[in-house]
């Protein structure tokens, strides 16, 4: 789990220098996905919320399923249901960060 956190959260922040992302500490955005590690589900296109409406992973069965998402401290998904309209924000980067 610690390796996964590094790959998905801390690593991109180190690599790209994204301001306020990658950690759960005071002053950072509270971006969290809650995952039920015991849940097993088949991925289907009808679950995809992206504009394209499909995924190349359709038909695959996976163990571990997102059950909630919090973005900037606001709950946006619970039990597979989107709770609010999308509300994107411009991302900021530390000067001189990146590859």
Locations of the language-model features?
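Active-site microenvironment of metallo-dependent hydrolases
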Residues: 1-99
């Amino acid at each position: 789990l610690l390796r996964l956190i590094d790959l998905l959260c801390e690593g991109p922040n180190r690599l790209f220098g994204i301001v306020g992302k990658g950690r759960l500490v005071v002053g950072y955005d509270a971006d969290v996905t809650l995952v039920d590690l015991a849940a097993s589900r088949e991925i289907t296109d009808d679950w995809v919320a992206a504009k394209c409406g499909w995924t190349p992973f359709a038909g695959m069965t996976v163990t571990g399923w997102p059950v909630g998402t919090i973005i900037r401290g606001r709950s946006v998904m619970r039990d597979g249901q989107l709770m609010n309209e999308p509300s994107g924000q411009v991302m900021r980067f530390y000067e001189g960060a990146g590859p």
